[in-house]
Amino acid sequence: MRRVYTNRRAHHEYELLERFEAGIALTGSEVKSVRAGGVDFRDAFARLNNGNVELEGLYIPTYTEATYNNHEPRRTRRLLLHREEIGKLKRALEQKGLTLVPTRLYQKGRVFKVELALARGKKLHDKRRAEAEKTLRRELREL
């Protein structure tokens, strides 16, 4: 079974510019916990640290069947990207107002991947305009 977790708030809070696929380094108990469910993207973001991309704030609940080897739910997790992609992200993040937001966590084959989006935060009036356009499209579709 292929479980996909999405960050629904990212589409509302940010204007998503460009997407990247990254591997994620997980421990054994984290993998089992992700398969069991309950991943939470609230407050999750990615950042560059010493040439590595790290994912902060992603909540993966502790695995109930694990013993003393259980993981910390909100630990910093390393993301695996090609060197060229990291360079591209570094240049893009130097621009004012851009951030790196996780949008999806999914399984591809036997490994887990995170979809990252280069994003710019929306202002309140932008959110209202997007909501009005969405409502208008919904009404037109109903006619």
UniProtKB/Swiss-Prot annotation:
SUPFAM superfamilies: Small protein B (SmpB). Pfam families: SmpB (PF01668). Its main location: cytoplasm. One of its GO terms (cellular component) is cytosol. CDD domains: SmpB. One of its GO terms (molecular function) is RNA binding. It is found in: Cytoplasm. One of its GO terms (biological process) is trans-translation. PROSITE patterns: SSRP (PS01317). InterPro entries: SmpB, SsrA-bd_prot, SsrA-bd_prot_CS. It comes from the Bacteria. Belongs to the SmpB family. Required for rescue of stalled ribosomes mediated by trans-translation. Binds to transfer-messenger RNA (tmRNA), required for stable association of tmRNA with ribosomes. tmRNA and SmpB together mimic tRNA shape, replacing the anticodon stem-loop with SmpB. tmRNA is encoded by the ssrA gene; the 2 termini fold to resemble tRNA(Ala) and it encodes a 'tag peptide', a short internal open reading frame. During trans-translation Ala-aminoacylated tmRNA acts like a tRNA, entering the A-site of stalled ribosomes, displacing the stalled mRNA. HAMAP family: SmpB (MF_00023). NCBIfam families: PRK05422.1, smpB. This is SsrA-binding protein. The gene is smpB.
